[in-house]
Every structure is written in C-alpha cells, then in structure tokens.
Amino acid sequence: MARLFRASCLLSLLLAGFIPPSQGQEKSKTDCHAGVGGTIYEYGALTIDGEEYIPFKQYAGKYILFVNVASYUGLTGQYVELNALQEELEPFGLVILGFPCNQFGKQEPGENSEILATLKYVRPGGGFTPNFQLFEKGDVNGEKEQKFYTFLKNSCPPTSELLGSPDRLFWEPMKVHDIRWNFEKFLVGPDGIPIMRWYHRTTVNSVKMDILTYMRRRAVWEAKGK
C-alpha cells in the first residue's frame, strides 16, 4: 500500500511538472538504426546571418555533430564545452553544427541577428563566440520541423520514453521520436549516415569519449577491410 501511495504521489508531481519528467527513463545515448535509407547529404541549411545556404554534402568525409541550441537554457553552458570539443576533435575530422530553436521553454526568443550578441554578452557571456557554425533559428519538431531533423529523428531511437511537461513544449503534433529538449545531439558518420543520438543532459565529455571510441572502432574496421 505504501508503495502504491508513493507511486501515486510521484505521478502527481510528474504531471504537475515539479520533477524532471524523464527521471529514471532516459539513456545517455542510443545507437541509430541499421540500414537507414538516404544520407544527410541530401539536405542543407541557411547560416545564421542568412547569407549562405550550406549543403551538408560539403562535410562529406567528416563526422558531423548536430546540436539544437538555445541561449537562455540551463544547459547553455554547454556552448563553452562544445567549443572545446570542436577544437580538440577537429584534427580527427569532427565538425559541430548548431541549430537555434525556440520550441523548448521558449528559451531562444531572439531574432537570428540577436543570438550571437546574446552569447557574447549575456550567456555564456564574457565575450564568448562559438567556433562552430550556427544556422538560422528553426523548428526541430512538429509540423514545420526542418527536413534534415526529420531524417535524423527517424534514423535514431529517442533517448527517453517521455517527452516532458506539455506546457513547456511548443509544437504539434508530438511524436515518439521527437527531440526532448535543447542540446540533444546526433552524430553522423563520414558516409553521411547517422550513428548515435545523445540525451540532452549527457555531458559533453561523455559525448567526446563516445565519439573517440567510435572513431577508433571504425578505423579498425576500415583497416581490416583493406
């Protein structure tokens, strides 16, 4: 009886949004599906200043880390860690791409022209400038989601069974494979095929170790195949 009462209380708190909705339900990462149809090279996006459309095939032969970002999130500090990751793994072929999105708690409210200034002077602040490419703000879930995010999400299972508190999520319709929050990450391999997907709270250091492990494993596979 006590166990049932506790479960009932936890459910009430969950529905009220007082505890993290995915607590105990998330995985730090998931491996993407085998036999994915198509590649990321079929897509592209406009840079944050709107001046250049970059086809993702420009990154052929590289590892691409896709990150949906926000300037007023509790995880915005990951920007600093992502800069360090880009610098450290760029010699090994990693390219980080950032995609501002306002669908999670309305935490990216500014215009494209305001985002870089926010990062520089507010959060993370202190003159911060990302050393990786940012693209125009857009949707990653819902009716108007960017098509390459549809491809990524369909290629990789979600890292959490639950979406979260509906009053903080701003899109429709909601689907099981949707991105859960800001700073979720997808890794695409040198052949344009998605490899891994990370939960938004997985540390950037853990992401780095997963990427390095995969790079080493792939190098062994390719050496054996020659």
Curated annotation (Swiss-Prot):
One Gene Ontology CC term in the entry: extracellular space
A GO biological-process term: response to oxidative stress
Primary localisation category: secreted
E.C. number: 1.11.1.9
InterPro entries per the UniProt record, alphabetical: Glutathione_peroxidase, GPX_AS, GPX_CS, Thioredoxin-like_sf
Keyword Lipoprotein: no
Gene3D superfamilies: Glutaredoxin
Segments traversing the membrane: none
Signal peptide: 1-24
Keywords: Oxidoreductase, Peroxidase, Secreted, Selenocysteine, Signal
Subunit structure: Homotetramer.
Record PANTHER family: GLUTATHIONE PEROXIDASE, GLUTATHIONE PEROXIDASE 3
Family label: Belongs to the glutathione peroxidase family.
Protein known as: Glutathione peroxidase 3
Organism: Bos taurus (Bovine)
